[in-house]
C-alpha cells in the first residue's frame, strides 16, 4: 500500500519511463521492477506497447462471438492515432477487418479504401517518429477525406473503437453510431 509504481500514460511512453528508471537506478543503485512501461532493454514486458490495443480487439472478438460473427470483412471506425489506436488498428487488420478512420485532437481522416498495413506503417512513422498530425495522411494518400475539428463517429461502419482518450462518445455520438449501423463499440 505504500508503494508507488510510475507508469506511462498519454504523452509518456517507454522513452520517458526509461529516463525515470535510469535516474532511479543511478540514485538507488538498484535494478528492481519499480517502473511499468519501460523498454525491454530495461527489463520491460515483451508486448507492453501493444497490450491495450490488442486487448481491446480480443474483448471485441468475444462480444462478436456472442452474435455468431467475427471481424472478417467488418468496417471499423478508430479514434486516436497514438499507441492504443495504432495497435488496435494493427489487430483489426490481422483479424480481417477494415480500418476506415483514425484521428487526433485536430480532426479525423476517412479512407474509403481502408488503412492497410502499409498505410498504418506510414501513420506509425508519422506519429511516433516525426510527431506529425493525422491530416498529413490525407495529403499523402489521394481520395482520403480529412475532417477538421470533428470525431469520426458520424461515418458509416460496422464497429466503433474509441482509442484516443476517455469520455470520447457522448449521447449525440451514440445516436449517430446507431443510426449508421454500428453493431459494436469496444
Residue ranges and their predicted role:
Residues 3-5, 32, 75-76, 97-101, ...:
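Structural motif
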Residues 39, 43-151:
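Glycine-rich phosphate/diphosphate-binding loop of Rossmann-like nucleotide-binding domains
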Residues 1, 36, 103, 178-179:
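Short acidic (Asp/Glu) and glycine-rich catalytic loops that position anionic groups and cofactors
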Residues 1-46:
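N-terminal ligand-binding/catalytic initiation module
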Residues 149-151, 156-159:
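Mobile, glycine- and charge-enriched loop segments
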Residues 157-186:
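ADP-ribose/adenylate-binding Rossmann-like module
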Residues 26, 61-66, 166, 175:
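Conserved helix-loop functional segments at active or binding sites
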Residues 9, 45, 49, 77, ...:
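Glycine- and other small-residue-rich loops at beta-strand/loop junctions that grip anionic moieties
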Amino acid at each position: 500500500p505504500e508503494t508507488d509504481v510510475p507508469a506511462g500514460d498519454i504523452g509518456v511512453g517507454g522513452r520517458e519511463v526509461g529516463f525515470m528508471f535510469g535516474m532511479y537506478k543511478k540514485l538507488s543503485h538498484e535494478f528492481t521492477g519499480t517502473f511499468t512501461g519501460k523498454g525491454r532493454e530495461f527489463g520491460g514486458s515483451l508486448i507492453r506497447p501493444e497490450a491495450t490495443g490488442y486487448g481491446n480487439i480480443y474483448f471485441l472478438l468475444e462480444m462478436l462471438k456472442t452474435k455468431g460473427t467475427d471481424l472478417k470483412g467488418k468496417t471499423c471506425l478508430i479514434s486516436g492515432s497514438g499507441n492504443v489506436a495504432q495497435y488496435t488498428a494493427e489487430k483489426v487488420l490481422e483479424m480481417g477487418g477494415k480500418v476506415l478512420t483514425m484521428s487526433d485532437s485536430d480532426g479525423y481522416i476517412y479512407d474509403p479504401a481502408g488503412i492497410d498495413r502499409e498505410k498504418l506503417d506510414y501513420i506509425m512513422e508519422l506519429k511516433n517518429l516525426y510527431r506529425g498530425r493525422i491530416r498529413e495522411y490525407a495529403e499523402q494518400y489521394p481520395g482520403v477525406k480529412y475532417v477538421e475539428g470533428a470525431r469520426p463517429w458520424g461515418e458509416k461502419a460496422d464497429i466503433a473503437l474509441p482509442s484516443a482518450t476517455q469520455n470520447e462518445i457522448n449521447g449525440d455520438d451514440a445516436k449517430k453510431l446507431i443510426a449508421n449501423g454500428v453493431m459494436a463499440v469496444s
